[in-house]
From Swiss-Prot:
Coiled-coil stretches noted in the UniProt entry, renumbered to this chain: none
Keyword Cytoplasm: no
Name this polypeptide is given: NADH-quinone oxidoreductase subunit C/D
Name of the encoding gene: nuoC
Major subcellular location class: membrane
Organism: Shewanella oneidensis (strain ATCC 700550 / JCM 31522 / CIP 106686 / LMG 19005 / NCIMB 14063 / MR-1)
Amino acid sequence: MKLTRDFPHNDTMAQWQPSDHKDAKVVGELFAHFGAEHFTVQTTRTGVPVVWLPRELLQDVVGFLRKLPAPFVMLYDLSATDERLRSHRDGLPQSDFTVFYHLISIDRNADVMLKVALAESDLHLPTITNHFPNANWYEREVWDLMGITFDGHPHLTRIMMPKSWQGHPLRKDYPARATEFDPFMLDAAKQDMEQENLLFKPEEWGLARGNENEDYMFLNLGPNHPSAHGAFRLVLQLDGEEVRNCVPDIGYHHRGAEKMGERQSWHSYIPYTDRVEYLGGVMNNLPYVLAVEKLAGIKVPQRVDMIRVMMAELFRIQSHLLFLGTYIQDVGAMTPVFFTFTDRQHIYTIIEAITGARMHPAWFRIGGVAHDLPKGWQRLVQDNLLSWLPKRLMDYEKAAMRNSILRGRTIGVAAYTTEQALAWGTTGAGLRATGLNFDVRKWRPYSGYEQFDFEVPVGSNGDAYDRATVRIEEIRQSMRIIEQCMNNMPEGPFKADHPLTTPPPKERTLQHIETLINHFLQVSWGPVMPAAESFQMIEATKGINSYYLTSDGSTMSYRTRIRTPSFAHLQQIPSVIKGSMVSDLIVYLGSIDFVMSDVDR
């Protein structure tokens, strides 16, 4: 493993002002190759070019972007929006449903978002799984939740909802509250049908039941298996102990997080973000509030930025400690997990003193944080973290990471290359373990990360061992960042002085009756955000997490798209583990570091 300091910092990614990005290089390349008349470039607050194109050009455009001199090698996200009730669409192509494709070029450190408009009477698009293998699950999700068909898809079936589910939940005409449904009844016939739907049929997935000499065993790992790390089912095609193939089955933890965003105010949705990746705490608040602040045009004080960075890094450390303990436990050592949980308690002592809560503080606010840092917070950080954890990390490395059994179980196991990681949309430590130092905090700084001195650890083999060593070193780098926050915390307010800061600063509410009325409306009804689209990605605990928000000039989001890293990471499993032993699969699952709430949302 090595530490890297040189990064292709992209200043344009930090700009949130409305822009059509027509001057972006990729837009010029598309115009030159296909003709400008085929495209509509949209003005947004996303910070990336957003280009509408006709359905007939989708395959050609995606293939063209894949083959450019500095190609767009990662399909970062793919989803859709039901446009039928949207009011503010001036200058955009007529569309009932819009499918969007978010592509990333590592060489350019640049993105482009492609949009295709569809009429309700013809909801068909060609699959792009021939260009990006990870489009498979994203297209299944769009069909499941929006009802859009992708012609040529290898297996277009439900992925979040049960097979028997009726309707497509993210459509605007689909109920958003449980009280809008008929009462749920489960009679014997329906129970039998649901049990039958859970039966795995290999032929449906193109898997053989055996060869001319022997039959394969099909084994369910999960959805209630301790090594599955949550409600996750993995159907294994086994030849003895060898995994010939496998089919991940997700959706058991799906809660409709994106649908909830359409019926909560911009402010009241913050607690829901905590629970998208339930180990990340305020790390989950960060991309959401940053995206909302882009919509509102809020620039927060420097003190707010530094407080947010410090709290995010505290949650990164406690998440990585949990990973370390459970990962070593998966390999077979039982003791370290008790030590890592003890160390996490030290982190929670700091978090609880600052926020008043532990795992789910919901502490970040639109325009700031809930309240200022308490007196004596520096001593808490010093005693419970900076004076404690460095020695513990050395103990973990000596006792566990240098242990011959752990090394034998993990080195060379579940390895993949940088190219394979990018093709499957892998981010975070899973990508950096292959040798690529792509860290959003360095490449696309947000919340003032460009002011901090820290390094990005990378591996070289892309195996289960490197993924663990990268995270251990990331803990050290997070401590460096936190120490800089402690030593350089600026004075100033903990909220921005802006009309859309929610809740508004107290001094704005105690002047006369109008200020009290505005305060009442903003807190009870919710702030009204300008009609626009915004996007924000961050380097979260498991990889890159982002929110893509669409405002229609209301108190609630018109569309809340949550892109989580774990969804992409689980889709990669079959390509990595084929030909390995079942014991290697357990090691691989532990090295991914995922929670199912992050996958299923």
